[in-house]
Design a protein with these regions (language model features):
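N-terminal pre-domain/capping segments
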Residues: 12-84, 92-107
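Aromatic/hydrophobic pocket-lining residues that form the small-molecule binding cavity
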Residues: 33, 66, 70, 101, ...
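Acidic (Asp/Glu)-rich catalytic clusters
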Residues: 39-44, 64-81, 108-114, 148-154, ...
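Active-site beta-loop-alpha junctions enriched in small/polar residues
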Residues: 26-30, 53-55, 85-87, 125-127, ...
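C-terminal helical cap(s) of enzyme catalytic domains, especially alpha/beta-barrels
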Residues: 273-283
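Hydrophobic faces of well-ordered beta-strands that scaffold small-molecule active sites
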Residues: 23-27, 48-50, 80-84, 120-122, ...
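Gly/Pro-rich active-site loop or hairpin
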Residues: 92-95, 171-179, 198-262
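Active-site acidic/histidine proton-transfer and metal-coordination neighborhood
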Residues: 75-76, 90-191, 201
Length: 283
């Protein structure tokens, strides 16, 4: 029985590896990263998005732990991307907070380099109670410092900025503003993460917005949206359910346009991952 299960798992893994599409999920971590990757294989995925530390605070990851754990997974076929903590605000004007943010993100970049990950994803900054123009300037300075860190340390990974939903005081939510903010960054060290839920919630057509940004897009967060277009809410939804407000035919057309990018599902129900990954492979 154990041999049969092992054989089935090996067949799944081989089929996933042979696929030319890089598709995966952000799933809750198992006890070990190796077990998490094995779970990913069962869903039919070959890409994994992870947090390296608690996403609800800005504390840097345990670098030594991740360097050691790499030895247990280095022979497995898996494409990684790291998502930085949700609480990091790269538009903050607080020097102490910015220093902590820098430490946390540079640690993630070192881990990303070790794991041969495509990069580290950041959310756009928030101005909170400050002047938006001051915070946008600071956000630009921060991004350039991160790019300089990657360059100076010869890291083979990128810093990736994710499109915003417009929730709260998020900045550069408008697609043209986002494009203008990012267009001059060195593409050797920088890329864009396009989130279909965020863009829809921000009030934009996902296909039109994608076409404006596609030259810099290296990761897609392929999500449905629980809230209507233009709601300015970050509420992800499964792809195939009545409460997804993005029409499935639009998502299908969008998926057909995606070439040479990593696609990550952040939909809320793990029971649907196998079905959703299969859908993305077949379109």
């Amino acid at each position: 029985m154990e041999y049969i299960i092992k054989s089935i798992l090996e067949d799944i893994i081989n089929n996933v590896i042979m696929s030319s599409k890089i598709i995966g999920v952000h799933i809750n971590r198992e006890k070990t990263l190796k077990k998490t990757i094995e779970k990913l294989y069962k869903y039919g995925g070959n890409a994994l998005q992870i947090f390296t530390s608690n996403p609800s605070n800005c504390s840097p990851a345990n670098l030594d732990k991740y360097i050691k754990e790499y030895e247990s997974i280095k022979d497995l076929q898996c494409n990684f991307v790291i998502h930085a903590s949700y609480t990091i605000n790269i538009g903050s004007l607080d020097p102490k907070q910015m220093k902590l943010n820098m430490n946390t993100i540079t640690t993630d970049l070192i881990i990303a380099n070790k794991y041969k990950a495509i990069g580290v994803i950041l959310h756009v900054g928030k101005y909170v109670k400050n002047k938006p123009e001051d915070c946008i300037k600071q956000m630009k300075v921060f991004m350039l410092e991160i790019i300089e860190f990657i360059k100076d340390n010869n890291l083979n990974t990128k810093i990736i900025l994710e499109t915003g939903a417009g929730q709260g005081t998020e900045m550069i939510v408008d697609i043209d503003d986002f494009n203008n903010f990012t267009k001059d960054f060195d593409k050797k060290y920088f890329g864009v993460c396009f989130d279909s839920c965020h863009v829809w919630s921000a009030g934009f057509d996902i296909i039109e917005a994608y076409n404006k940004l596609k030259q810099n897009i290296i990761v897609i967060h392929f999500n449905g949206s629980k809230t209507p277009k233009g709601s300015l809410k970050d509420r992800h939804e499964q792809l195939f359910c009545d409460t997804n407000t993005i029409p499935i035919d639009k998502l299908t057309t969008f998926a057909k346009n995606l070439k040479n990018v990593m696609i990550i599902l952040e939909t809320p129900n793990e029971d649907e991952y196998a079905k959703e990954i299969d859908y993305l492979r077949c379109v």
